[in-house]
């Protein structure tokens, strides 16, 4: 990756009058703002369909897009909704918060209304989209329609015939739920249209999109339901083991994610075709792809299904470099960022080196005794050119709140490293951002850190549910003053996007 800079901001966190950030004019305005701030990258979180915990890392599909991101204004322009209908909808009270329960009710109602008026069955572009994407779209749309029929229950709790995909049941539900299936295909068609238009606009402005994919699929996903042989499921399609990570300084019982683990021997037998296809599709949507939990390709933490915590888990070997050799042979060299944070064994480090992918460096980890990695790896003077540096990620505290929660001794270390004993604590985050801008690595800064916000703007606190993935940026926060500051530091340290 070239010497450059970017901003991390989930699509969901964009300003919007419709309850959640989406592919509306505000997204295009943000692209313009990034360009004028001298940025090269816009890093986002996964775009998948979110489920009960609202996490983009637990999606109903590895391929489908989140219909919440569909611009209602575009549907108004198409004549399938009216501006008054959108204005009357109640999406939530706060401009800086996402109320997912209201979104589910109101967005769902409006999207169904749009579908009912669309006459989509006579749309040649829709027919072509369905044909080109039937390899994932047919299973996904049927999965969602059947899920609605079973009142939202996970697929492992459905009736046996459709849970195990008996042919007579598949045929029955395709006939019985035809219009529901078409509705879910329609949503994916609109998502695809609007996202590709936004990405094309960003690329025209010299802004490259860094997408993000979780290593695992959710258990309650069309992927696991349609391809049970590729996962560690028993003869009744119930998991035998699930994913997570062991205890560390941030979580004494570890993290129990609950995702089904891959049956890697099956993937190897097919030449890793599922993964090749998945990554090929990602590069249709993004310019660069960050793969979450990269260490899971070297070793993955296997937790017996039904465990209450991650503590009973153990490490097992993953596919290693063989997978990425197969991907490169099929797709050529692609730009991938390896999320290699936390405790890294020597074999994981070797996998990252062998892959040639840039790893990640997080400034907060350099001074935080709770982190299980090597602190020296995260000191900016040690960042290699082939790395991407962050103040923090979506899983971390904001820089301002992090500095307040570390010990006084750790705060002293920060001051010593900065050689800065005079800057007021409330402004020290700017010095820390400048610190990684001086490093050799590509720099990606979360929007909250540029704004100097506290943990009320934190995106996610791992191992918790209920208050995550909710923060939204207010349009008034995208000021010319901030843009000028970002442009100035970007220029000063040779990271300016002159495109």
Each language-model region and where it sits:
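Outer-envelope exported proteins of Gram-negative bacteria
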Residues: 45, 208-210, 214, 288, ...
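Conserved, well-ordered alpha-helix/loop/beta-strand core segments that scaffold catalytic motifs
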Residues: 184, 188-217
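Alpha-amylase-like alpha-glycosidases and glucanotransferases acting on alpha-linked glucans and related
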Residues: 10, 16, 54-192, 217-444, ...
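Catalytic domains of carbohydrate-active enzymes, especially glycoside hydrolases
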Residues: 25-50, 285-286
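Surface-exposed amphipathic alpha-helices with a cationic face
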Residues: 35, 195-203, 328, 352-353
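N-terminal regions that are enriched for targeting/export leaders
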Residues: 1-12, 28
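Domain-scale activation on soluble regions of proteins
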Residues: 36, 162, 169-170, 471, ...
